[in-house]
């Protein structure tokens, strides 16, 4: 698992598995990116500093 935080845009990207991104679904401030086979590849958290404060 790898992660990258971009403070300029306040986005946290968590790479959970290998594979190419095929499509994504957004629910609130979280975008879940999937492979063609439907496996979760990456999570993208928008407004990350606000979202992670609730964890």
Each model region followed by its residue ranges:
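A short, polar/charged loop-to-alpha-helix boundary motif
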Residues: 50-55
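Structured beta-strand/loop patches that form or line metal/cofactor-binding pockets in enzymes
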Residues: 2, 7, 13-31
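Acidic surface patches and DE-rich sequence motifs
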Residues: 35
């Amino acid at each position: 698992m790898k992660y990258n935080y971009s403070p300029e845009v306040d986005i946290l990207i968590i790479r959970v598995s290998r594979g190419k991104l095929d499509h994504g679904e957004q629910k609130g401030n979280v975008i879940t990116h999937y492979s063609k086979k439907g496996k979760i590849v990456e999570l993208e958290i928008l407004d990350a500093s606000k979202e992670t404060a609730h964890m």
